[in-house]
UniProtKB/Swiss-Prot annotation:
Its EC number is 1.1.1.25. It catalyses: shikimate + NADP(+) = 3-dehydroshikimate + NADPH + H(+). Pathway: Metabolic intermediate biosynthesis; chorismate biosynthesis; chorismate from D-erythrose 4-phosphate and phosphoenolpyruvate: step 4/7. It comes from Pyrobaculum islandicum (strain DSM 4184 / JCM 9189 / GEO3). Gene3D superfamilies: Leucine Dehydrogenase, chain A, domain 1 (3.40.50.10860), NAD(P)-binding Rossmann-like Domain (3.40.50.720). Belongs to the shikimate dehydrogenase family. GO terms for molecular function: NADP binding; shikimate 3-dehydrogenase (NADP+) activity. The keyword Transit peptide does not apply. The gene is aroE. This is Shikimate dehydrogenase (NADP(+)). The active site is at 64 (proton acceptor). Shikimate binds at residues 14-16, 60, 85, 100, 203. Coiled coil: none annotated. Pfam families: SDH_C (PF18317), Shikimate_DH (PF01488), Shikimate_dh_N (PF08501). It comes from the Archaea.
Length: 260
C-alpha cells in the first residue's frame, strides 16, 4: 500500500513520511508513505493518479480548501469546515476528512469550553481551528489575519453557518486560548498575556517557534505543532487502516526527523 502527503515544498521538509513509516513498521503493515510536491495547477491530475495508485493521502498548504471540490465524498464535519487534510481512497473513490479539527478538539477542547479563543490565520488550518472551538463551546471566538478582509469573510461564513458569534479583529486581543493556524514560526503573532493555553500548528523548521518560547517563558501550557501533527496523523491512520497506532512511536520519529 502507498500513502503520501501533498503540498508545495514538502519533500525533505515534512516529517509525515518519517512518522507514518515508523508507525507502519511497528504495526507490521507493508506500506510506504512519501512526500510529493504538487503545484496548484497539477492538483486535478494528481488526484486522478491517486485513485489508482494510493490507499490514502494527507493534504497540506496550499491545497486543503481547493481539494474539496475534486473529491467524490466528504465527511460532514470536513464539508462544514470547508477544508480537507486527510483523504481515503476506497474502490477508486476519494473520500475527504479533516483530522486537523478532530486532533485539535481532542487535545484542547477542555481548555476551549467556555473560553475566549483567538485564532491567527484564515486558511485551511484556521477553518479547522474555528470548527474545533465552536464544537468545544467556546464562549467567544475571534479571528485575526494579516489580510483583514480574509479574516472578516471567514468570520462571517462561520457565524452564518453555525449560528454563533465569530468576530474578525484587526489589533491585539487578549484571549484564554490562542491558536496560531499559520506556518509562521519566527515572529510574535499574538498577545499571550492572560492566556492559559497556546496552540501552534507550525513545526517546520522547529516546533520551538518564537511564540512557543514566549508561552513557555510566561508559564502557559503549550500544544505545539508536533503534538498536533502526531494526533492528526494517528487519526488519519485509523481512517485508512482501521487500527489505533502508537502515538509514542510516531512522536519519537518526528522528533528524530527534526533533530530534537
Amino acid at each position: 500500500m502507498y500513502f503520501a502527503v501533498i503540498g508545495t515544498h514538502v519533500r525533505g521538509k515534512s516529517a509525515s513520511p518519517a512518522m507514518h513509516n515508523a508507525s507502519f513498521k511497528t504495526l507490521g503493515i507493508n506500506a510506504v508513505y512519501i512526500a510529493l510536491d504538487v503545484p496548484r495547477e497539477e492538483l486535478p491530475c494528481f488526484l486522478q493518479l491517486a485513485r489508482l495508485n494510493l490507499r490514502g493521502f494527507n493534504v497540506t498548504i496550499p491545497h486543503k480548501e481547493e481539494v474539496v471540490k475534486y473529491l467524490d465524498s466528504v465527511a460532514a464535519d470536513a464539508r462544514a469546515i470547508g477544508a480537507v487534510n486527510t483523504v481515503l481512497v476506497e474502490r477508486n473513490l476519494l473520500v475527504g476528512y479533516n483530522t486537523d479539527a478532530s486532533a485539535l478538539y481532542q487535545l484542547a477542547s477542555s481548555h476551549m469550553k467556555g473560553a475566549d479563543v483567538l485564532i491567527v490565520g484564515a486558511g485551511g488550518a484556521a477553518r479547522a481551528a474555528l470548527f474545533a472551538a465552536i464544537k468545544a463551546e467556546a464562549r467567544a471566538v475571534y479571528i485575526t489575519n494579516r489580510t483583514y478582509e480574509r479574516a472578516e469573510a471567514l468570520a462571517r461564513e462561520f457565524a452564518e453557518k453555525f449560528k454563533r458569534e465569530v468576530k474578525a479583529v484587526r489589533g491585539p486581543v487578549k484571549a484564554d486560548v490562542v491558536i496560531n493556524a499559520t506556518p509562521v514560526y519566527d515572529a510574535v503573532v499574538a498577545d499571550l498575556s492572560g492566556a492559559s493555553l497556546y496552540v501552534d500548528f507550525a513545526y517546520i523548521p522547529t516546533p520551538r517557534t518564537k511564540m512557543v518560547e514566549e508561552a513557555q517563558r510566561l508559564g502557559i501550557k503549550v500544544i505545539d505543532g508536533v503534538d498536533l501533527l502526531v494526533e492528526q496523523g494517528a487519526q488519519a491512520e485509523k481512517i485508512w487502516l482501521g487500527v489505533e497506532p502508537d502515538r509514542t512511536v510516531m512522536k519519537r520519529a518526528v522528533l528524530e526527523f527534526l533533530g530534537i
